[in-house]
A protein has these predicted regions:
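All-alpha amphipathic helical-bundle segments outside canonical DNA-binding/catalytic cores
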Residues: 123-139, 156-159
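A short, Lys/Arg-enriched amphipathic alpha-helix from helix-turn-helix/homeodomain DNA-binding modules
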Residues: 110, 153-177, 181-186
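Generic detection of well-ordered alpha-helical segments
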Residues: 138, 142, 160-163, 167, ...
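Basic/polar phosphate-binding segments, predominantly the helix-turn-helix DNA-binding elements
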Residues: 176-202
């Protein structure tokens, strides 16, 4: 099973790659997504949002999210995991809020955003790259955050078992976990929890 809680030590990871189904997960980084071919579905919390070529999405840190590809044709996107440390002037927004809808439609995405994403693909994550990456992330946030309607991030939750499972992993990822302990702590049966693992996190 692939990890569903990721603690990214790197400041920035970015790649353009073929999109695929990615099960629910969360991490301390913000995730930036720009569809370059085809279509993609991004789920944040319990909501699913459709993305087409040119659309941009921003997933704030510590929010459970996943990806699905329903298009039979190729789908590619630029995916970036960026530490909030790259955007110190936006710390409060990134920690306390999140967009009602994380997707900005292609026609509303400003050219600066695409330029910054493409530029980060070019510059290596070396010492001079870090300064450039910080500048590019600041540009992206400065140009996209005003386009979002924000809500308190504590309101993006759910009592559903998948959400509870991922949240549990996030809170206890440094501990040794067993199916019986986790089921007990979540107040569900071991067989129900086992079905979540086999059906969702395969």
């Amino acid at each position: 099973m692939k990890p569903i809680y990721e603690e990214n030590e790197e400041t920035l990871e970015i790649a353009e790659q073929i999109s695929c189904h990615i099960p629910p997960h969360l991490h301390k980084s913000m995730e930036l997504v720009s569809v370059t071919e085809g279509t993609l579905e991004i789920g944040v919390g319990t909501e699913l949002y459709h993305m087409e070529k040119g659309d941009f999405a921003l997933v704030f840190p510590e929010l459970i999210h996943h990806y699905q590809v329903f298009n039979s044709e190729s789908c590619k996107a630029i995916y970036a995991l960026a530490s909030p440390l790259l955007a110190p002037s936006y710390t409060k927004e990134l920690q306390q809020f999140c967009p009602v809808n994380p997707v900005i439609l292609a026609q509303e995405v400003l050219p600066d955003v695409n330029y910054a994403l493409r530029s980060m693909l070019v510059y290596p994550a070396a010492s001079q790259g870090h300064v450039l990456h910080q500048a590019f992330i600041q540009i992206i946030l400065a140009r996209t955050l005003p386009l979002f309607e924000m809500i308190d991030n504590s309101s993006v939750g759910s009592n559903d078992i998948i959400y509870q499972t991922v949240s549990y992993f996030a809170a206890h990822y440094t501990e040794e976990l067993t199916l019986s302990k986790m089921a007990h702590d979540l107040g569900i049966s071991q067989s129900s929890l086992s079905r979540v693992f086999s059906g969702t996190f395969h």
